[in-house]
């Protein structure tokens, strides 16, 4: 009887009450790419990244002293999760005198069955390892 009540309660819950699926990604190397090629940073110059993305399109890519954050287009494609955000603001851009620091196009792709992904933001083009998670917990 309790199981039936629980099933009915879950069925009656609206889609808005279900938290979005979220992923947390971290890098083990730092790679930069431009039109003329790519290069990996030396281990002593490695900058760890903290990336959060959810299936409601929210994305945060943190590196250095701030984060590119905002809403991105989200798609599921054959076991891949893809986020694409245009001109996402950098959280410390107001402190910068660099006019290019205001925003960046951000792309994140995760192969959900493996937890392996790739992030591209402001010159960074870096492989990442990802796990499902809840932001702010763990």
Question: Positions of the model-derived regions?
Answer:
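Edge beta-strand at a domain terminus
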Residues: 43, 120-138
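Low-complexity, intrinsically disordered Gly/Pro/Thr-rich segments
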Residues: 103-119
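Hydrophobic h-region of N-terminal signal peptides that target proteins for export
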Residues: 2-15
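Secreted/processed peptides and extracellular or luminal domains of membrane proteins
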Residues: 31, 39, 43-45, 65-68, ...
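Short, solvent-exposed aromatic-acidic interface loops
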Residues: 29-32, 62-69, 120-126
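Short, solvent-exposed loop/hinge segments that bridge or flank secondary-structure elements
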Residues: 19-59, 94-97
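Contiguous, well-ordered beta-strand patches that form the walls/edges
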Residues: 57-100
């Amino acid at each position: 009887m309790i199981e039936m009540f629980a099933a009915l309660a879950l069925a009656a819950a609206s889609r808005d009450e279900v938290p979005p699926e979220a992923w947390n990604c971290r890098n083990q190397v730092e790679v930069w790419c431009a039109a003329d090629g790519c290069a990996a940073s030396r281990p002593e110059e490695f900058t760890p990244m903290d990336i959060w993305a959810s299936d409601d399109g929210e994305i945060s890519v943190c590196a250095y002293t701030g984060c590119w954050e905002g809403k991105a287009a989200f798609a599921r494609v054959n076991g891949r999760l893809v986020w694409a955000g245009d001109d996402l603001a950098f959280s410390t851009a107001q402190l910068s005198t660099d006019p290019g620091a205001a925003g960046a196009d951000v792309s994140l792709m995760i192969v959900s069955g493996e937890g392996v992904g790739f992030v591209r933001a402001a010159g960074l083009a870096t492989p990442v390892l990802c796990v499902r998670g809840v932001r702010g917990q763990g």
